Amino acid sequence: MSEQQPRVIESKEIMTLLPHRYPFLLVDRVLDFKEGEWLKAIKNISVNEPCFTGHFPGEPILPGVLILEALAQAMGILAFKTLELKGGELFYFAGIDEARFKRPVLPGDQMELNVQVIKERRGITAFTGVATVNGEIACEAKLMCARR
């Protein structure tokens, strides 16, 4: 049995799925995914991120809410691919439970975003999200997105 090739989604296609644009598009590339189950993506953290101007001057740290938003955007991409939707539909961040931040995300880091579907019902998707840097957990949470 042959090993399946990763299913990569580049930024140009991501922009056809998500309505977000600079400075709020927080997924650079999808490394692989399986419809209805999971997705792995990356976000490269640049010293030029607008949030670093004030968070914190001289000690830039990516705000936790942006890590959670990146996980939600990764889930949105998975939902579009799973439901074979075209751009134009929206997924709203609907809830966060058990969010934990375990290490800072800094300029120069590459953040890996891993999302896994827990359940989907009536347009609401519950999922787990884990953001890592160099294999270390930066953030983990249970999240929900609602389709409009």
Swiss-Prot record:
Residues annotated as signal peptide: none
Active site residues of this protein: H55
Subcellular location: Cytoplasm
Cellular component GO terms held in the UniProt record: cytoplasm; membrane
Alphabetized UniProt keyword annotations: Cytoplasm, Lipid A biosynthesis, Lipid biosynthesis, Lipid metabolism, Lyase
GO biological process, one term: lipid A biosynthetic process
Catalytic activities: a (3R)-hydroxyacyl-[ACP] = a (2E)-enoyl-[ACP] + H2O
Enzyme class: lyase
InterPro entries according to UniProt: FabA_FabZ, FabZ, HotDog_dom_sf
MF-aspect GO terms: (3R)-hydroxyacyl-[acyl-carrier-protein] dehydratase activity
Any Pfam family the entry gives: FabA
Domain of life of the native organism: Bacteria
E.C. code: 4.2.1.59
HAMAP family registered for this protein in UniProt: FabZ
Functional description taken from the UniProt entry: Involved in unsaturated fatty acids biosynthesis. Catalyzes the dehydration of short chain beta-hydroxyacyl-ACPs and long chain saturated and unsaturated beta-hydroxyacyl-ACPs.
Family: Belongs to the thioester dehydratase family. FabZ subfamily.
NCBIfam families: fabZ, PRK00006.1
Protein name: 3-hydroxyacyl-[acyl-carrier-protein] dehydratase FabZ
Organism per entry: Haemophilus influenzae (strain PittEE)
UniProt gene name: fabZ
